[in-house]
């Protein structure tokens, strides 16, 4: 079940933004390989949850986008995973 925009805004970690039907955060790193290690770590979390984010890797940044395509928007699992990714960071 998707969450309303108000529910998402009320519960979204301050480090994340809502963009339409997705939540997004860009993580910044001192170097490329540290960002790659972070991607590996969050990929393991995503695989365990069987909920896979869209990840864009830059030179010293990693952008993560979460949504539930099957449900058609942002769900509880997206918010939970955002918090888990922040903990990993």
Predicted features by range, described:
Residues 2-89:
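Long, contiguous binding/interaction regions
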């Amino acid at each position: 079940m998707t969450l309303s925009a108000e529910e998402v805004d009320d519960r979204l970690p301050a480090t994340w933004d809502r963009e339409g039907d997705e939540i997004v955060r860009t993580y910044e790193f001192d170097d490329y390989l540290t960002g790659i290690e972070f991607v590996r770590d969050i990929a393991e979390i995503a695989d365990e949850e069987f909920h896979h984010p869209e990840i864009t890797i830059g030179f010293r940044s990693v952008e993560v986008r979460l949504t539930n395509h099957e449900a058609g928007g942002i769900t509880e699992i997206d918010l939970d995973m955002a918090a888990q990714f922040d903990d990993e960071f």
